[in-house]
Amino acid sequence: MWSNDHTERFPWQVPVAEGGTKEFAHLPYAVLHYVVVSNELNSPKILTCPQDPNRIRTNVWDAPLHVSLSYFAGLNADETNPDTILAGDRNVSTSSSTVTGLLTVQNARDLQATKDIHKTFVHVALVDGSAAQLNPADLRKAAAVEMKALTNQPMRLVIP
């Protein structure tokens, strides 16, 4: 949707002057990347996972979305690599605790699902339009596939 209108690029790949968030991709604010696609979404309610106990669901766009957002943005997502992760539940980390901000994963084996939302799994949306529920082993496999597709670059996620 949004990427179709921006030459197959996602917000973090498009300069601010063209309606994207590229200059902010290094910042720890996932909400910035979702706000720019708000015209493509019917309601901000879909930005909150119903099972996320630490987020407040809202029906209005002028509410503070940082307290509602349940999903990370996958900064490596790229239309030319359909196996890259576009978004997912925020309960991913390289430790046993949920983190916020920019998470850089150097080794796929370090990525794990925390127990804060879905106990032992994470929902992800891939660039190819598919979605998956991944257990920790499958999450690490998906990360390894993404990192290999991107010539072994670290995986970068902005977690709300």
Model regions and ranges:
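Soluble or luminal CAZymes and related metallo-dependent hydrolases
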Residues: A25-H33, T114, F121
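Acidic, glycine-rich loop-and-strand cores that form catalytic or ligand-binding grooves
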Residues: L41-Q106
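Residues that flank catalytic or metal-binding motifs in active/ligand-binding sites
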Residues: H33, K45, N81, H118-T120, ...
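C-terminal accessory segments of extracellular proteins
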Residues: T94-P160
